[in-house]
Regions:
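Glycine-rich cofactor phosphate-binding loops and adjacent beta1-alpha1 units
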Residues: 1
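Glycine-rich flavin
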Residues: 4-7, 11-105
Length: 105
């Protein structure tokens, strides 16, 4: 990273660190697709002799688990940034001029 070569590097993110794919897009979608496959697996398992009773889906429990995984991934990104001498700011920022970034607060 640029910080390792002496550049001043910072990231300002008002919501969560990790980007759209990790926080709002690809990762949540893949976890939802993965979780949705269990109902079909139960049906298939019954065809192979498993005595499994169909259950119900608990959206609250799923969302809790999803958020736990997103928290874990965000922690990985934050640790990588900290270990790379990148300052992080949990707020929105705007570019004021060619040499200045202004934090919202």
């Amino acid at each position: 990273m640029a910080a390792k070569y002496g550049a001043k590097v910072a990231i300002a993110e008002e919501y969560r660190v990790g980007g759209t794919c990790v926080i709002r897009g690809c990762v949540p979608k893949k976890l939802m697709v993965f979780a949705s496959g269990y109902a079909e697996l139960v049906d298939e398992a019954q065809c192979f002799g498993w005595d499994i009773k169909p259950g119900t889906f608990d959206w609250h429990a799923f969302k809790t688990r999803l958020n736990t995984e997103l928290d874990r991934l965000e922690g990985v990104y934050r640790k990588l940034l900290a270990n790379s001498d990148v300052d992080t700011y949990d707020q929105r920022a705007t570019i004021k001029d060619a040499h200045t970034v202004q934090l919202a607060n």
